Amino acid sequence: MERISTNQLYNSGIPVTVPSPLPAIPATLDENIPRIPDGQNVPRERELRSTPMPPHQNQSTVAPLHGHFQSSTGSVGPLRSSQAIRFSSVSSNEQYTNANPYNSQPPSSGSSSTLNYGSQYGGFEPSLTDFPRDAGPTWCPDPVDGLLGYTDDVPAGNNLTENSSIAAGDELAKQSEWWNDFMNYDWKDIDNTACTETQPQVGPAAQSSVAVHQSAAQQSVSSQSGEPSAVAIPSPSGASNTSNSKTRMRWTPELHERFVDAVNLLGGSEKATPKGVLKLMKADNLTIYHVKSHLQKYRTARYRPELSEGSSEKKAASKEDIPSIDLKGGNFDLTEALRLQLELQKRLHEQLEIQRSLQLRIEEQGKCLQMMLEQQCIPGTDKAVDASTSAEGTKPSSDLPESSAVKDVPENSQNGIAKQTESGDR
């Protein structure tokens, strides 16, 4: 069986229905619906093109509609649209596609199709019973006449997406402009506060740079004149005029020699005062604070208390043993250093030999003591042996009478026995 095309259905005037789970509208309603001439559709299509879709509506939120389709042939048929309205286009397969749910193609090239919703244009107004229970008030009360009117040129789905994307782009552009204005306003305030904070710091920095240049110029002048001068090093926190008097200073060897001479002229470090030393030195960029601190260091370095007398004696002996080396004069050579190292090694070996000889003597003395103790113990043992021998010699002399008595007893007994035997024989 051959399939009937949609063009034949539209030309024959048979009502066309799209499959939908919603109940169908009875055919008797076709008689009550007035027909709209084609002339009225043209200005309405222009209005639909000019009116964009509201941005808050989306394809998925369109509620089910019921309307009528008006064609150029004059036939009017009921048309349903579910949550995803699908119209078939004229193609080889003539099947329903899911790519563009709002895409509808006209039955012929010369005819135009519109979907009119609302009683004011002569269309069919749906009743409350036609809506499904699941569908709620998903749209706003604004008129939606311009939502489903399409032309031949551009598909309806693309038009909707373009209008929605344009509206969303406009909203994003407005939000970005508002955000940029807000950020620019805040950054301007921050920049103004930063400028006001940094402006007061320009003066002290310039003053410190001027002070550094002045000190460098004075140093160059003093070096040309041949007089020693103190090199002042500004501290990192010295940005005010009050800190110029307490700037750090590097004491050169020449300046230290002049300081020592001034202290000696004043009678020593204990009697010298910072003011008197400053007057005698007559150095540039030198304040009383510098002289005072240097004088305290000089006193502590010169009069350092010794820990004990033994340590002082050891230090004196070491100074006498080791020859002095002039490191400042530059006479220190490698050969001299090697010679000193050899001398130290020799002294160490000598000390080790002395310790060994002492140990040997101690061992010999110990052996002598042991021999003496042994000799003292031997005479005592001889006396004990003599006493024991003498005691043993006395004991046999005392035992002699007993033995003689014993001997006498057997002899008497024998004599008696012999006498008895003689008397018995008789």
Curated annotation (Swiss-Prot):
<feature type="region of interest" description="Disordered">
    <location>
        <begin position="302"/>
        <end position="326"/>
    </location>
</feature>
<dbReference type="Pfam" id="PF14379">
    <property type="entry name" value="Myb_CC_LHEQLE"/>
</dbReference>
<dbReference type="InterPro" id="IPR017930">
    <property type="entry name" value="Myb_dom"/>
</dbReference>
<feature type="region of interest" description="Disordered">
    <location>
        <begin position="198"/>
        <end position="247"/>
    </location>
</feature>
<feature type="region of interest" description="Disordered">
    <location>
        <begin position="382"/>
        <end position="426"/>
    </location>
</feature>
<feature type="domain" description="HTH myb-type">
    <location>
        <begin position="243"/>
        <end position="303"/>
    </location>
</feature>
<comment type="function">
    <text>Transcription factor involved in phosphate starvation signaling. Binds to P1BS, an imperfect palindromic sequence 5'-GNATATNC-3', to promote the expression of inorganic phosphate (Pi) starvation-responsive genes. Functionally redundant with PHR1 and PHR3 in regulating Pi starvation response and Pi homeostasis. Involved in both systematic and local Pi-signaling pathways. Regulates several Pi transporters. Regulates the expression of PT2. Directly up-regulates SPX1 and SPX2 expression, but PHR2 binding to DNA is repressed redundantly by SPX1 and SPX2 in a PI-dependent manner.</text>
</comment>
<keyword id="KW-0805">Transcription regulation</keyword>
<feature type="compositionally biased region" description="Polar residues">
    <location>
        <begin position="69"/>
        <end position="81"/>
    </location>
</feature>
<keyword id="KW-0804">Transcription</keyword>
<feature type="compositionally biased region" description="Polar residues">
    <location>
        <begin position="387"/>
        <end position="401"/>
    </location>
</feature>
<dbReference type="GO" id="GO:0005634">
    <property type="term" value="C:nucleus"/>
</dbReference>
<feature type="compositionally biased region" description="Low complexity">
    <location>
        <begin position="205"/>
        <end position="225"/>
    </location>
</feature>
<comment type="subunit">
    <text>Interacts (via C-terminus) with SPX4 (via N-terminus) in the presence of inositol polyphosphate. Interacts (via C-terminus) with SPX1 and SPX2 (via SPX domain). Interacts with RLI1 isoform RLI1b in the nucleus.</text>
</comment>
<dbReference type="InterPro" id="IPR006447">
    <property type="entry name" value="Myb_dom_plants"/>
</dbReference>
<feature type="compositionally biased region" description="Polar residues">
    <location>
        <begin position="411"/>
        <end position="426"/>
    </location>
</feature>
<dbReference type="GO" id="GO:0010966">
    <property type="term" value="P:regulation of phosphate transport"/>
</dbReference>
<dbReference type="GO" id="GO:0016036">
    <property type="term" value="P:cellular response to phosphate starvation"/>
</dbReference>
<feature type="region of interest" description="Disordered">
    <location>
        <begin position="96"/>
        <end position="123"/>
    </location>
</feature>
<dbReference type="GO" id="GO:0003700">
    <property type="term" value="F:DNA-binding transcription factor activity"/>
</dbReference>
<dbReference type="InterPro" id="IPR009057">
    <property type="entry name" value="Homeodomain-like_sf"/>
</dbReference>
<dbReference type="Pfam" id="PF00249">
    <property type="entry name" value="Myb_DNA-binding"/>
</dbReference>
<keyword id="KW-0963">Cytoplasm</keyword>
<dbReference type="InterPro" id="IPR025756">
    <property type="entry name" value="Myb_CC_LHEQLE"/>
</dbReference>
<keyword id="KW-0539">Nucleus</keyword>
<dbReference type="GO" id="GO:0005737">
    <property type="term" value="C:cytoplasm"/>
</dbReference>
<dbReference type="InterPro" id="IPR001005">
    <property type="entry name" value="SANT/Myb"/>
</dbReference>
<dbReference type="GO" id="GO:0003677">
    <property type="term" value="F:DNA binding"/>
</dbReference>
<feature type="compositionally biased region" description="Basic and acidic residues">
    <location>
        <begin position="303"/>
        <end position="322"/>
    </location>
</feature>
<dbReference type="InterPro" id="IPR046955">
    <property type="entry name" value="PHR1-like"/>
</dbReference>
<dbReference type="GO" id="GO:0010167">
    <property type="term" value="P:response to nitrate"/>
</dbReference>
<feature type="region of interest" description="Disordered">
    <location>
        <begin position="27"/>
        <end position="81"/>
    </location>
</feature>
<feature type="DNA-binding region" description="H-T-H motif">
    <location>
        <begin position="274"/>
        <end position="299"/>
    </location>
</feature>
<feature type="compositionally biased region" description="Polar residues">
    <location>
        <begin position="237"/>
        <end position="246"/>
    </location>
</feature>
<protein>
    <recommendedName>
        <fullName>Protein PHOSPHATE STARVATION RESPONSE 2</fullName>
    </recommendedName>
</protein>
<feature type="compositionally biased region" description="Low complexity">
    <location>
        <begin position="102"/>
        <end position="119"/>
    </location>
</feature>
<keyword id="KW-0238">DNA-binding</keyword>
